[in-house]
């Protein structure tokens, strides 16, 4: 009788569960994975090299396009690195706005992660539920920056503008939405952005309850996730896990608590931690994180309501002057012209800034040589370390479980391929 050999299967990059452009070369024994070899680089755009040929401000929008589901958190690490080198600090109000939008971004990311993970495993409803709330949060992005995704809202020294007093309204009824529905949507958008966010934080816990009703005790969901892709705490640390992947394995490491930046040390929140280190625990950690983010957003809204103030530093060598000042004062006009033609010069040195990104520790290592452009920009993407563990996590599991493991790793290729 002929010997049965292992066979090789190409999974992706066109596969709908491949989360973009992942190509996996799977070595299978029947339906059991013996080896998983991820091939990356299909979304490589030379971000680190491009940044060396742009001024510090011009390189900022590239950050949005790294992990294109957690846009503002990428920007945050970049502007923090520049601020370290310049030796400046954003005003307190700007810090609160940054923290609030970091947490809005975290919720956006986890909703996408949860919805697409459930869709990969075969639960379609959660995906549609999650995108209902994402729509509201995208409107917050649009209100402050004009863009729903690539906001470029954070700037060295603060944020681009203060929170607006009005929200964009939906137009007339269409074949997709009736008058009653449009009126209900616009009612929530009748006040300021802070009113809208506060209304969202009041509604959101019941939305998370809905997701949990659909998934947490669902027998099929538990059968697909419990005991799959188990990583013990020591191995998780050795593999370079951060974020929900590390906390799902039972290690309470969160940069917002261990190395607080901006105003996180003034916030009251808990760090959810898993027990078993399997896909189900990582799912529970992300759901709990959404609830904690909601608490932080609520605290920020309350503080921002009662404390008006500047959102950008006054140093016009770094931050552009106001439009009115620029049109009435020659010196301000010169500052404006210099900033937008040449940019500011950063003193020579190197800095590393890391934020607790929704996927883990997102770090920017920046080297400056005194010019108006970065000499070297190194991006530390959390998903890169997670993807390299895929082989270890998938071994001995079925092909169908590979989909679950990719979903639980929350892979986005913008940051992995850069």
From Swiss-Prot:
Q: Which domain of life is it from?
A: Bacteria
Quote the subcellular location field of this record.
Cell inner membrane
Q: What class of enzyme is it?
A: translocase
Q: Keywords in alphabetical order, please.
A: Cell inner membrane, Cell membrane, Membrane, NAD, Quinone, Translocase, Transport, Ubiquinone
Q: Does the keyword ATP-binding apply?
A: no
What EC number(s) has UniProt assigned to this enzyme?
Answer: 7.1.1.-
A molecular function annotated in GO for this UniProt entry is: quinone binding
Extract the Gene3D superfamilies matched here. Cytochrome-c3 Hydrogenase, chain B
Q: Which reaction does it catalyse?
A: a quinone + NADH + 5 H(+)(in) = a quinol + NAD(+) + 4 H(+)(out)
Entry membrane topology: Peripheral membrane protein
**GO CC annotations, alphabetized:** plasma membrane
Q: What does this protein do?
A: NDH-1 shuttles electrons from NADH, via FMN and iron-sulfur (Fe-S) centers, to quinones in the respiratory chain. The immediate electron acceptor for the enzyme in this species is believed to be ubiquinone. Couples the redox reaction to proton translocation (for every two electrons transferred, four hydrogen ions are translocated across the cytoplasmic membrane), and thus conserves the redox energy in a proton gradient.
The family this protein is said to belong to: Belongs to the complex I 49 kDa subunit family.
Task: Tell me the subunit arrangement.
Answer: NDH-1 is composed of 14 different subunits. Subunits NuoB, C, D, E, F, and G constitute the peripheral sector of the complex.
* Name of the protein in question: NADH-quinone oxidoreductase subunit D
Organism of this sequence: Bordetella pertussis (strain Tohama I / ATCC BAA-589 / NCTC 13251)
What gene is this protein translated from?
nuoD
């Amino acid at each position: 009788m002929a010997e049965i050999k292992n066979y090789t299967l190409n999974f992706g990059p066109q596969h709908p569960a491949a989360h973009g452009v992942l190509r996996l070369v799977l070595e299978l024994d029947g339906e059991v994975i013996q080896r998983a070899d991820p091939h990356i680089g299909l979304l490589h755009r030379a971000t680190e090299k491009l940044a060396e040929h742009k001024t510090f401000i011009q390189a900022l929008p590239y950050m949005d396009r790294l992990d294109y589901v957690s846009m503002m958190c990428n920007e945050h690490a970049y502007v923090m690195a520049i601020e370290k080198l310049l030796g400046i600090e954003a005003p307190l109000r700007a810090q609160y706005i940054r923290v609030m939008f970091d947490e809005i971004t975290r919720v956006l990311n986890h909703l996408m992660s949860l919805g697409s993970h459930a869709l990969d495993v075969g639960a379609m409803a959660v995906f549609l539920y999650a995108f209902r709330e994402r729509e509201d949060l995208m409107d917050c992005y649009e209100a402050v920056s004009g863009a729903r995704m690539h906001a470029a809202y954070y700037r060295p020294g603060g944020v681009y503008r203060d929170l607006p007093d009005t929200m964009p309204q939906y137009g007339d009824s269409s074949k997709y939405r009736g008058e009653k529905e449009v009126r209900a949507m616009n009612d929530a958008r009748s006040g300021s952005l802070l009113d809208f966010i506060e209304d969202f934080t009041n509604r959101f816990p019941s939305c998370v309850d809905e997701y949990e009703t659909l998934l947490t005790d669902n027998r099929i969901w538990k059968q697909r996730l419990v005991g799959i892709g188990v990583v013990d705490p020591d191995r998780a640390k050795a593999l370079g896990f951060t974020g929900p992947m590390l906390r799902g394995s039972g290690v309470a490491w969160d940069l917002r608590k261990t190395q607080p930046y901006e105003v996180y040390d003034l916030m009251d929140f808990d760090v959810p931690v898993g027990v078993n280190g399997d896909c189900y625990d990582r799912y529970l950690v992300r759901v709990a994180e959404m609830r904690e983010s909601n608490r932080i957003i609520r605290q920020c809204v309350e503080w921002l309501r009662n404390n008006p103030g500047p959102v950008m530093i006054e140093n016009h060598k770094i931050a552009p002057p106001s439009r009115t000042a620029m049109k009435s004062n020659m010196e301000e006009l010169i500052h404006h012209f210099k900033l937008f033609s040449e940019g500011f010069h950063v003193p020579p040195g190197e800095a590393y800034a890391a934020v607790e990104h929704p996927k883990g520790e997102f770090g920017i290592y920046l080297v400056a040589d005194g010019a108006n452009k970065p000499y070297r920009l190194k991006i530390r993407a959390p998903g890169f370390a997670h993807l390299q563990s895929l082989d270890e996590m998938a071994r001995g599991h079925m092909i169908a479980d590979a989909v679950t493991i990719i979903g639980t790793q929350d892979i986005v290729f913008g940051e992995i391929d850069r």
